[in-house]
Amino acid sequence: MSLNNARPLLGCIADDFTGATDLANMLVRGGMRTVQSIGIPSAEMAAGLDADAIVIALKSRTTPSADAVAESLAALEWLRERGCEQIFFKYCSTFDSTAAGNIGQVSEALLEQLDSDFTLACPAFPENGRTIFRGHLFVQDQLLSESGMQNHPLTPMTDANLVRVLQAQTRHKVGLLRYDSIAQGVEGVRNRIAELRAEGVSMAIADALSDADLYTLGEACADLPLLTGGSGLALGLPGNFRKAGKLRDIDAAKQVAISGGEVVLAGSASVATNGQVAAWLEDNRPALRINPLDLAAGKPVVEQALTFARDAGQTVLIYATSTPDEVKAVQKELGVERSGAMVEAALGEIAKGLLNAGVRRFVVAGGETSGAVVQALGVQLLQIGAQIDPGVPATVSSGAQPLALALKSGNFGARDFFAKALKQLAGAA
């Protein structure tokens, strides 16, 4: 990773690790040299970071809103000290949150700290089937509340009306930037934003059905100090900086290949990850399932997994992925937070043990799982490389012992993602 004291243009705060990589991937595709930090960088790491965009990955999506606000404001302060011209708060394209927060509370705090009176909220990601119309979020052809997300173990999404969902999380007035305004182009969006501001609206859910809509929104909001949303909303941001003559034309995705062993670790219970695990099993590739009840009983699950990986003689999948019914049964017995925390901790310990055994390439499925794994591996900075599947790039860590990682949000990736990611990480991804 080259270093030269360049001033970053865009500062990003992501509420989980895979969301951060998703956003960083989008920015790299737009030509911005992007570095992802696991938490707020230390002074040593920060010295001379050479990047057009810096994405700080927090683990705040499901933390109490007061904690999420404090962490996000600390990240904001760090980014502003580096001279970032615009701030982007990234959350999931399925708006993962509850009435307790914390998308609204964090957005509210960032707005106030930036002394701004308005921001957009747009989690749309059409390339992955997430679209918004009349304020309602769709996943493919289904409303969010009927897409399987209503069964999410930590943030069950039972309402697709994002205006209503966001309003429950903030004291500020929430409005809607409807599609008919977006269809009028950049000036139409700017005019509608002016009207919303005059009505006392501080946050507006923005409709978006296509990438073209996201480019329109991005251009229209070039002067807003804060934007919030999914990675899709960042599509148009590199173009704004390029138009202003602030962005160089280079290959932002260039990376080196990393040699060593490889593994797939999956903790997500999402529909997509369940399909990816099934595809691996159908190919008769070696896999070991971790049972949270065994962890709770004190069985040597981590040691068994490390032995399994060592003796397999080929790349293995170690997974805790389960169906929604199985997840609910475990949660009923162990509790929601305890069951998830135990799985994350175990997969983190397994990753650390595999690192000590020579594994250097890690494919990880699930936002919470990815957070646990990168922390266990001691990863602090990631250089973002080429895209594997929409929203998921290959990455390489900095430091004396570089690692190649693919950190996948639970619901992202094609059915053959695991095999595809391993292949890309093994090359000059």
From Swiss-Prot:
Q: Which keywords describe this protein according to UniProt?
A: ATP-binding, Carbohydrate metabolism, Kinase, Nucleotide-binding, Transferase
Which amino acids does the record list as binding ATP?
S268, G366, G367, E368, T369, G410
Q: Which domain of life is it from?
A: Bacteria
Q: Which EC number applies?
A: 2.7.1.217
Task: Output the Pfam families linked to this UniProt entry.
Answer: NBD_C, SBD_N
Coiled-coil segments: none
GO MF, one annotated term: kinase activity
- Provide the catalytic activity annotation: 3-dehydro-L-erythronate + ATP = 3-dehydro-4-O-phospho-L-erythronate + ADP + H(+); 3-dehydro-D-erythronate + ATP = 3-dehydro-4-O-phospho-D-erythronate + ADP + H(+)
User: Sorted alphabetically, which SUPFAM superfamilies does this protein's record hold?
Assistant: YgbK-like
Q: Does the keyword Signal apply?
A: no
Family membership, please give it: Belongs to the four-carbon acid sugar kinase family.
Q: What does this protein do?
A: Catalyzes the ATP-dependent phosphorylation of 3-oxo-tetronate to 3-oxo-tetronate 4-phosphate.
Q: What is the name of this protein?
A: 3-oxo-tetronate kinase
